[in-house]
Amino acid sequence: MIRRREFRVPSSDGKSGLHTVLWEPDGEVRQLLLISHGMTEHILRYDPFARFLAEQGIAVIGHDHLGHGGTVQNGRYGYFADKAGHVCVIRDLHRTASRIRVMYPGRPLYMLGHSMG
């Protein structure tokens, strides 16, 4: 059985909590995958795909970027930051990658990005 957990990872913007989802296999975790969704998407769009990968022994993690999905604040969809929002997105990906590396040390980590991701 696949476990899906949702939690918040502090954003590098210093104000937001990134809605983060982790799909974990029931058995041994062989590999890790970080999914970076595209513009106007959200991480739960990848739920069926992430579940399939978890069934293959791959732990999958991803978060809603600033201005997307469960991370949207004040209805500002697609908004990252006043300045250098792209830098926040990159730093946030590093934060999420660090989270799963701590949880599963020594496993190879891959990244899948779609469109803006």
Question: Where do the protein language model's features map onto the residues?
Answer:
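Active-site glycine-rich loops that stabilize anionic/oxyanionic intermediates
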Residues: H37-E41
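N-terminal cap/lid segment of alpha/beta-hydrolase-fold proteins
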Residues: M1-G27
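Short N-terminal helix/helix-N-cap motif within the alpha/beta-hydrolase-1
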Residues: I43-L44, G70
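Alpha/beta-hydrolase fold nucleophile elbow
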Residues: Y104-S115
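Alpha/beta-hydrolase active-site loop
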Residues: A81-V102
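Conserved Rossmann-like nucleotide-binding pocket used by diverse enzymes
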Residues: I35, I61, L112
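Conserved alpha/beta-hydrolase
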Residues: A50-R76
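Alpha/beta-hydrolase fold active-site loops
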Residues: R30-L33, P108
